[in-house]
């Protein structure tokens, strides 16, 4: 099982939210592997968390049921977690993107004219 498919991002968290509170809020949807709460020191309104489930289906159910729900007087956002891709998963860039001066680019213009 891929970790990324079983992990949700929880955003717009209130400053009073704890990992324990998140665990208890999300445990009805399935076995939780981990809860990681992240706080920005200078911006408490930017707190977010990652909740990793054992099964991707549980993460999907949590997103469907918890997105836009109220937690500690805040409307939270629950979405799939977006992790940085590993080197093996990253596509090899086109040489033209790395060295545009060496590529033979063509500019395409629309040849259609407005109809009346």
UniProtKB/Swiss-Prot annotation:
Main location: cytoplasm
Highest taxon of source: Eukaryota
InterPro entries: Nucleotide-bd_a/b_plait_sf, PPIE_RRM, RBD_domain_sf, RRM_dom
UniProt entry tagged with the keyword NAD: no
GO molecular function: RNA binding
GO biological process per UniProt: mRNA cis splicing, via spliceosome
Location within or outside the cell: Cytoplasm; Nucleus
RRM domain location: 6-83
Transmembrane segments: none
Keywords: Cytoplasm, Nucleus, RNA-binding
GO CC list: cytosol; nucleus
Pfam family of the protein (one): RRM_1
Keyword Hydrolase: no
Protein name per its UniProtKB record: Uncharacterized RNA-binding protein C428.12c
Organism encoding this protein: Schizosaccharomyces pombe (strain 972 / ATCC 24843)
